[in-house]
């Protein structure tokens, strides 16, 4: 007689009950890798409560955070890019524009208009990275230029929040021309004695950094923002050297005198208000 008798009936594994979790309930911080309740991040102005990492936000979210409630009047909302070169890489440029409009709900990578910060009138232009990486084409350059010209007309400060991968390659020389165009407009603002405050957020790179983003009377940045011309990976491959820790981050730039200050998102409005009072002698 066998000591152990095999059961004839097969062993059926107990099915585990899978709980379906709705998408977007939790978010992973790319800096500290913590899994955090999404609403907790939103309550903290899209800043990680564990490590202070500043998540990217949309242009409209930033406007709501910085400007007085109900004060913003948008200009040139219907302005759209045109595929004048009939550019095509893996995809036609006109199709990329249509896809970006559908994804972001915007007609291009910048929103600009008039508003107020603690009752101080300002003209503000804000990049939205979700529209083709915040790249600068003819529409972006025109909007920035119009914002500067409106500040001249209103005799008030101009603020630009940058978040861009640089010039838009699909527009070739027309996108590069915007660097000179925006810089020339800011030169006229400077001659008029009106303040221009540049706020660089993650990331601010390429032709945007090489033009108006670095021309502020005060150059501010959010914590850990990537700021530079070429990206760190491209630089390492070119010079074949390992870059220093934190290279091109806002803290590194502040340490080396490239920017004036780093301001956390919850403190941004108060700091801007302070700067505006100093500049406008109020």
Curated annotation (Swiss-Prot):
It catalyses: N(6)-carboxybiotinyl-L-lysyl-[protein] + acetyl-CoA = N(6)-biotinyl-L-lysyl-[protein] + malonyl-CoA. Zn(2+) binds at residues 29, 32, 48, 51. Its cofactor is Zn(2+). Transmembrane segments: none annotated. Pathway: Lipid metabolism; malonyl-CoA biosynthesis; malonyl-CoA from acetyl-CoA: step 1/1. It is an enzyme of class 2 (transferase). Belongs to the AccD/PCCB family. This is Acetyl-coenzyme A carboxylase carboxyl transferase subunit beta. It comes from Syntrophotalea carbinolica (strain DSM 2380 / NBRC 103641 / GraBd1) (Pelobacter carbinolicus). The gene is accD.
